[in-house]
């Protein structure tokens, strides 16, 4: 079947009231961005609907791209026809005939958005269903759980018929919720956290703490590759690479071993807050899950939070590890995340880290460090890489 138009539906956007136009424009921008290599395609919107006019492009190739776009509730490949009822009946039958496998049951659902159309929706349903039943006596109507729903949308700009509905990612279009800075470690959790934040409509930048020579160039490349995976859903990611060796060395030499992770995380938050301020990010995001490791108890989170004022978003906080792993497989980050390259947290992990650190003790242990000087130096030497949607393409400059 040669489809004419892909009809895009968006559910949550319809609830946004006064901001509706802004949200719809952001979704149009996202759709145009993922379809930019389909030169014949045109994207337009009308109240409550968006249309991708194919002009001969492969409908299924286009729909594969649409599966990456947050903010889409569902979409359907459609044929556009004249509003003449006989034409509607014939084209609906043609669509049902080409389904493989053939459905055993069906239902017709028409929507008469153009109220000038002379036939009521219920009558359109009856006429189209009767025509299909006469031509295909092996199938029957089921109004409750049909194998196939034949959708007929009669609108002022055209009549659209479809038999397939593909579920979209849902969520909100990227860019409508402000900017968030993701702490990207290279493990399983943080890329999933980034993906979930993208689903809530944020623009994503990432920060990574690199401890060369304790961590290798391959560990940094793994993080670049994970950031590249996220560009599939959110576009270009600016990756801030922070030199962290001097800070970790100072902490290891001067602070109690059981508080190493806690103090190290407090430094990460201080640096991340500075970078967020410089990039106009309104929150940090981490891959922490409550109770998963020693540094992710409520007491640890509280002690770490004390040193900054910017919000910290933890989208995985109530998730089980198995659910996080499932998402990482779905978004194709799992195999990268389990590559055996150590990050800055794992190379300095103490044997018995404190699980219920006290903010007062953490602050006292930090008194032997020149906290402000260490933070300022790390921020000054941070490098930025632009991770684009193109394979493994990066550009580097100084922060």
Swiss-Prot record:
It comes from Brevibacillus brevis (strain 47 / JCM 6285 / NBRC 100599). GO terms for cellular component: cytosol. GO terms for biological process: thiamine biosynthetic process; thiamine diphosphate biosynthetic process; thiazole biosynthetic process; tRNA 4-thiouridine biosynthesis. It is found in: Cytoplasm. Pathway: Cofactor biosynthesis; thiamine diphosphate biosynthesis. GO terms for molecular function: ATP binding; CCA tRNA nucleotidyltransferase activity; tRNA binding; tRNA-uracil-4 sulfurtransferase activity. CDD domains: PPase_ThiI, THUMP_ThiI. It comes from the Bacteria. Catalyzes the ATP-dependent transfer of a sulfur to tRNA to produce 4-thiouridine in position 8 of tRNAs, which functions as a near-UV photosensor. Also catalyzes the transfer of sulfur to the sulfur carrier protein ThiS, forming ThiS-thiocarboxylate. This is a step in the synthesis of thiazole, in the thiamine biosynthesis pathway. The sulfur is donated as persulfide by IscS. This is Probable tRNA sulfurtransferase. Keywords: ATP-binding, Cytoplasm, Nucleotide-binding, RNA-binding, Thiamine biosynthesis, Transferase, tRNA-binding. Its EC number is 2.8.1.4. It catalyses: [ThiI sulfur-carrier protein]-S-sulfanyl-L-cysteine + a uridine in tRNA + 2 reduced [2Fe-2S]-[ferredoxin] + ATP + H(+) = [ThiI sulfur-carrier protein]-L-cysteine + a 4-thiouridine in tRNA + 2 oxidized [2Fe-2S]-[ferredoxin] + AMP + diphosphate; [ThiS sulfur-carrier protein]-C-terminal Gly-Gly-AMP + S-sulfanyl-L-cysteinyl-[cysteine desulfurase] + AH2 = [ThiS sulfur-carrier protein]-C-terminal-Gly-aminoethanethioate + L-cysteinyl-[cysteine desulfurase] + A + AMP + 2 H(+). InterPro entries: Rossmann-like_a/b/a_fold, ThiI_AANH, ThiI_fer, ThiI_N, THUMP_dom, THUMP_ThiI, tRNA_STrfase, tRNA_sulfurtransferase_ThiI. HAMAP family: ThiI. SUPFAM superfamilies: Adenine nucleotide alpha hydrolases-like, THUMP domain-like. Its main location: cytoplasm. SMART domains: THUMP (SM00981). Belongs to the ThiI family. ATP binds at residues 183-184, 208-209, 265, 287, 296. PROSITE patterns: THUMP. Residues 60-165 form the THUMP domain. PANTHER family: TRNA SULFURTRANSFERASE (PTHR43209:SF1).
């Amino acid at each position: 079947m040669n489809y004419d138009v892909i009809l895009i539906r968006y559910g949550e956007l319809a609830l946004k009231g006064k901001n509706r136009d802004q949200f719809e424009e952001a979704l149009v921008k996202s759709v145009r961005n993922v379809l930019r290599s389909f030169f014949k395609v045109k994207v337009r919107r009308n109240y409550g609907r968006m249309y991708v006019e194919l002009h001969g492009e492969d409908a299924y190739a286009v729909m594969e791209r649409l599966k990456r776009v947050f903010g889409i509730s569902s979409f359907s490949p459609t044929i556009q026809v004249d509003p003449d009822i006989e034409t509607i009946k014939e084209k609906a039958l043609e669509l049902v005939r080409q389904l493989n496998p053939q459905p055993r049951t069906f239902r017709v659902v028409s929507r008469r958005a153009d109220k000038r159309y002379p036939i009521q929706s219920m009558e359109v349903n009856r006429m189209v269903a009767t025509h299909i039943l006469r031509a295909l006596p092996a199938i029957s109507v089921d109004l409750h759980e049909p194998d196939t729903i034949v959708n007929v949308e009669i609108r002022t700009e055209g009549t659209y018929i479809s038999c397939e509905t593909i579920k979209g990612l849902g969520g909100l279009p990227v860019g409508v919720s402000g900017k968030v800075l993701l702490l990207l470690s290279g493990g399983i959790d943080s890329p999933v956290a980034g993906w979930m934040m993208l689903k809530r409509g944020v623009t994503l930048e990432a920060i990574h703490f690199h401890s060369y020579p304790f961590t290798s160039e391959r560990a940094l490349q793994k993080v670049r590759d994970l950031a590249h995976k996220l560009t599939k859903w959110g576009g270009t990611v600016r990756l801030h690479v922070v030199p962290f060796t001097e800070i970790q060395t100072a902490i290891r030499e001067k602070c109690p071993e059981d508080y190493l992770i806690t103090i190290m995380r407090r430094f990460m938050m201080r640096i991340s807050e500075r970078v967020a301020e410089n990039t106009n990010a309104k929150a940090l995001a981490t891959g922490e899950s409550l109770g998963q490791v020693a540094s992710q108890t409520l007491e640890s989170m509280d002690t770490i939070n004390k040193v900054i004022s910017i919000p910290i978003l933890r989208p995985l906080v109530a998730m089980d590890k198995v659910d996080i792993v499932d998402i990482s497989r779905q978004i194709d980050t799992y195999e990268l995340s389990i590559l055996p390259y150590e990050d800055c947290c794992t190379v300095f992990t103490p044997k018995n880290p404190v699980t219920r650190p006290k903010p007062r003790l953490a602050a006292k242990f930090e008194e032997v460090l020149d906290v402000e000087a260490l933070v300022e130096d790390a921020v000054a030497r941070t490098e930025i890489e632009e991770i684009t949607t193109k394979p493994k393409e990066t550009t580097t400059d100084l922060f």
